[in-house]
Amino acid sequence: MSTNAIAVLRGDTVSGIIRFKQDKEGLPTTVTGEVKGLTPGLHGFHIHQYGDTTNGCISAGPHFNPYNKTHGDRTDEIRHVGDLGNIEAGADGTAHISISDQHIQLLGPNSIIGRSIVVHADQDDLGKGVGAKKDESLKTGNAGARVACGIVAIGAAS
């Protein structure tokens, strides 16, 4: 039996619903959903450490990084567990999400249930920033302000 989770994203002008599904511990987790109200283009998309939104999305803390690695792309070998790359909003401000990720888990000791998912204002540079932006790139991907977030909660069986 698979495990399901859901996050309802809220921000000043951005909202969405993200669903997670994992069939068995150690297998990839599928992430699907829709985010509305974004500016057209790419936006950083990450799992953050805490499921705390008491002070808006800033309370979510840093990217979920249980192995103490540097920031990277979703497909990179070296990355935070919470690094999910970018989502792309079309001209209507809507991003449709459909990914499978081996690193985020709903089951086991590094489960993302109870943590938060955050959409950022800017494109994530995927840890490839240079010059004055390099240090921040290796932590956050220079993805900018947090425009929406939600807590990853246990979802109903599908």
UniProtKB/Swiss-Prot annotation:
Record-listed E.C. numbers: 1.15.1.1
GO molecular function, a single term: copper ion binding
Keyword Transmembrane helix carried by entry: no
Subcellular location: Cytoplasm
Keyword presence, Metal-binding: yes
GO CC term (a single one): cytoplasm
Record InterPro entries: SOD-like_Cu/Zn_dom_sf, SOD_Cu/Zn_/chaperone, SOD_Cu/Zn_BS, SOD_Cu_Zn_dom
Cofactor(s) demanded: Cu cation; Zn(2+)
Domain of life where this protein originates: Eukaryota
Annotated positions binding Zn(2+): 63, 71, 80, 83
Catalytically driven reaction(s): 2 superoxide + 2 H(+) = H2O2 + O2
The entry's keywords: Antioxidant, Copper, Cytoplasm, Disulfide bond, Metal-binding, Oxidoreductase, Zinc
Cross-referenced Pfam families: Sod_Cu
Bridged cysteine pairs (disulfide): 57-149
Cofactor binding note: Binds 1 copper ion per subunit.
Residues the record lists as binding Cu cation: 46, 48, 63, 120
Subunit relationships: Homodimer.
Function according to Swiss-Prot or TrEMBL: Destroys radicals which are normally produced within the cells and which are toxic to biological systems.
Entry's family note: Belongs to the Cu-Zn superoxide dismutase family.
UniProt-recorded name of the protein: Superoxide dismutase [Cu-Zn]
Species lineage: Eukaryota, Metazoa, Ecdysozoa, Nematoda, Chromadorea
Gene this protein is translated from: sod-1
